[in-house]
UniProtKB/Swiss-Prot annotation:
<feature type="binding site">
    <location>
        <begin position="87"/>
        <end position="89"/>
    </location>
    <ligand>
        <name>substrate</name>
    </ligand>
</feature>
<comment type="similarity">
    <text>Belongs to the dUTPase family.</text>
</comment>
<dbReference type="InterPro" id="IPR008181">
    <property type="entry name" value="dUTPase"/>
</dbReference>
<dbReference type="GO" id="GO:0046081">
    <property type="term" value="P:dUTP catabolic process"/>
</dbReference>
<protein>
    <recommendedName>
        <fullName>Deoxyuridine 5'-triphosphate nucleotidohydrolase</fullName>
        <ecNumber>3.6.1.23</ecNumber>
    </recommendedName>
</protein>
<feature type="binding site">
    <location>
        <position position="83"/>
    </location>
    <ligand>
        <name>substrate</name>
    </ligand>
</feature>
<dbReference type="GO" id="GO:0006226">
    <property type="term" value="P:dUMP biosynthetic process"/>
</dbReference>
<dbReference type="Pfam" id="PF00692">
    <property type="entry name" value="dUTPase"/>
</dbReference>
<comment type="function">
    <text>This enzyme is involved in nucleotide metabolism: it produces dUMP, the immediate precursor of thymidine nucleotides and it decreases the intracellular concentration of dUTP so that uracil cannot be incorporated into DNA.</text>
</comment>
<feature type="binding site">
    <location>
        <begin position="70"/>
        <end position="72"/>
    </location>
    <ligand>
        <name>substrate</name>
    </ligand>
</feature>
<dbReference type="InterPro" id="IPR029054">
    <property type="entry name" value="dUTPase-like"/>
</dbReference>
<keyword id="KW-0479">Metal-binding</keyword>
<keyword id="KW-0546">Nucleotide metabolism</keyword>
<feature type="binding site">
    <location>
        <position position="97"/>
    </location>
    <ligand>
        <name>substrate</name>
    </ligand>
</feature>
<keyword id="KW-0378">Hydrolase</keyword>
<dbReference type="GO" id="GO:0000287">
    <property type="term" value="F:magnesium ion binding"/>
</dbReference>
<dbReference type="InterPro" id="IPR036157">
    <property type="entry name" value="dUTPase-like_sf"/>
</dbReference>
């Protein structure tokens, strides 16, 4: 199994705040926590950057990571990622910050140590571009939006 080097920058991680974990053996996402000194109140429509206390260097160009919102925060409170999905390239070497957006109607308080996002490692396939005049014909052709029907 491939291992990814995740450095802990904030000494509170593993002490005051739990180490990042997978909630179950079948979890794809690794929970990320708000590494804050004090609670942060986020007004409706507002965004803020929240540190995780972690730094990462994936190093393998065949891998990347994506940061995703936690479903409960989005559904129950309107708390999602400000950039919708965070992409972490294999050559990035800095701290993981989470852009949090309150799209809800009420203020929301982010507590120190609260699980705020999840990170999933994914394979990467880079495109190779070739100039062509046309594609080989297929049954579908250029049929786009709704072309294959609803049933």
């Amino acid at each position: 199994m491939k291992k990814i080097d995740v450095k802990i920058l904030d000494p509170r991680v593993g002490q005051q705040f739990p180490l990042p974990t997978y909630a179950t053996s079948g979890s794809a996402g690794l929970d990320l926590r708000a590494c804050l000194d004090d609670a942060v109140e986020l007004a409706p429509g507002a965004t803020t950057l929240v540190p995780t206390g972690l730094a990462i260097h994936i190093a393998d160009p065949s891998l990347a990571a994506v940061m995703l919102p936690r479903s409960g925060l989005g559904h129950k409170h309107g708390i999602v990622l400000g950039n919708l999905v965070g992409l972490i390239d294999s050559d990035y070497q800095g701290q993981l910050m989470v852009s949090i957006w309150n799209r809800g109607q009420d203020s929301f308080t982010i507590e120190p140590g609260e699980r705020i996002a999840q990170m999933v490692f994914v394979p990467v396939v880079q495109a190779e571009f070739n100039l062509v005049e046309a594609f080989d014909a297929t049954e579908r052709g250029e049929g786009g939006f709704g072309h294959s029907g609803r049933k």
